[in-house]
A protein has these predicted regions:
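A short, charge-rich alpha-helical start-of-domain segment used by transcription regulators
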Residues: 2-25, 29, 38
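Sigma70-family region 2
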Residues: 4-5, 32, 45-59, 78-80
Length: 83
């Protein structure tokens, strides 16, 4: 593992610990299912990890909420499409 990767790993861990409850609560308010909110919050951090090459450390807060909003929108869209 190179130094840059190790630095991002530390940054990612810090972000997860710092923001996971905010993201989970943001999602839970919008979908009203606490257990599903937990799963979707995990998906937010998976997407952050998948796009780590494009993450700007100064704007990670807004990026996390943008990802969360998009995941919630997708979930709601799929729900109504099934009905």
């Amino acid at each position: 593992m190179n130094k840059q990767q190790a630095t991002f790993d530390d940054f990612f861990s810090e972000c997860y610990l710092k923001y996971k409850e905010y993201i989970k609560n943001y999602i839970a308010i919008r979908i009203c299912h606490p257990h599903e909110a937990e799963d979707l919050a995990q998906d937010v951090f998976v997407r952050l990890w998948e796009h780590r090459a494009f993450v700007n450390k100064d704007t990670v807060w807004s990026l996390l909420f943008t990802i969360a909003r998009n995941i919630v929108t997708d979930k709601i869209r799929r729900y109504y499409k099934q009905e």
